[in-house]
Amino acid sequence: MTTAAAAWFAVVFFLLPGFLVAWVAGLRVPAAVTTALPVTFGVIGVSSWMWGVTSAPFNLWTFGVSMVLALAVAGGWRYAFARKARRGGDVPWHRALFPGKVEWTHWGIPFVGVAVAAWMAVTDRLSWLAQMPNGADNIVQGWDSQWHANAVRFVMETGVASSTRMGELQNFETHARLFYPSGFHAGVALFAEAAGLEPIRAVNIASTVLPAVALPLTMV
């Protein structure tokens, strides 16, 4: 997969799960899009912890199970509010499940701005990476980048992504307990597995795409 294709794939991969959960829970499409990224990582964070207390590895299959559970909870949440809205029988089910309407004219320009800003940020960073030795496979020579790449590789190789079990990586000799927020690393590990990327390349692409998409979305 080329770097550009992987970047486009990352946009869909990180936005789609959160969008589906937010929309099923009752948000309208524009609001579901704007909240998609934090919802995705919320599901990933809870999922990685949940599977960390079992013997099952955290990977695309177990995350898929978590998505089914999240969608079921979101659907139950929406149904409960729709049922409450229908008390008395005056409101039809469709109206109760999909109240109001979306004024697309109010959302069009902001979303165009988000798309343009994200595209500019991603293309600038990817162009910079392309000029480096080994391109997107080049790791920045700093503690943070190396730690993040190591954490992603650890998740991919062991299936351990729980934030309460990061001592198994950082305290390699003793495995002393350590809490470290690992939602980013769990998400990037899933992305790398789905796209067939090595950890360093996945970290570089995800570190480019995620802030480029998240920052303009916060301004909508």
Question: Where are the predicted features?
Answer:
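Membrane-embedded, hydrophobic transmembrane alpha-helices
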Residues: 1-107
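Lipid-exposed faces of alpha-helical membrane segments in multi-pass integral membrane proteins
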Residues: 39, 43, 47, 65, ...
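Active-site lumenal/periplasmic loops and adjacent helix-entry segments of GT-C-fold
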Residues: 109, 117-220
